[in-house]
Amino acid sequence: MKIIANRMQVNVGQEAEYKRRHDEIWPELSQLLKEHGIHEYRIFLDEETCALFAILMVENPDRLIDLPSNPIMQKWWAYMKDIMPSNSDFSPVSTELKEVFYLP
């Protein structure tokens, strides 16, 4: 099992909408993520800066390689692009975070 952490951003004033959309996550997207070996996925919001911190546990990171080309994933990204910085393929602008501490 590998833990992956990322930093993203939600546009100022769109925090509640971001949460609402995730509270209503599409069942097909949830299923897709699980099928790709994701067991836990949490996103935290820093309300002062609108920074998002995502943490996910995945069986094997190699299983995530084809996720960006999946039509469900692409549709979700297109749905989210109006409330967060996005790349040209509509994926969220994201920076992988380096683990610097772990308490077993």
Set out the residue ranges of the language-model regions.
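Charge-dense, helix-prone N-terminal extensions
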Residues: V10-V12, P27-Q31, P85-L97, Y102-P104
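Short amphipathic alpha-helical segments
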Residues: Q14-H39
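An amphipathic, aromatic/His-enriched active-site/gating alpha helix that lines ligand/cofactor pockets
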Residues: H36-H39, M57-T95
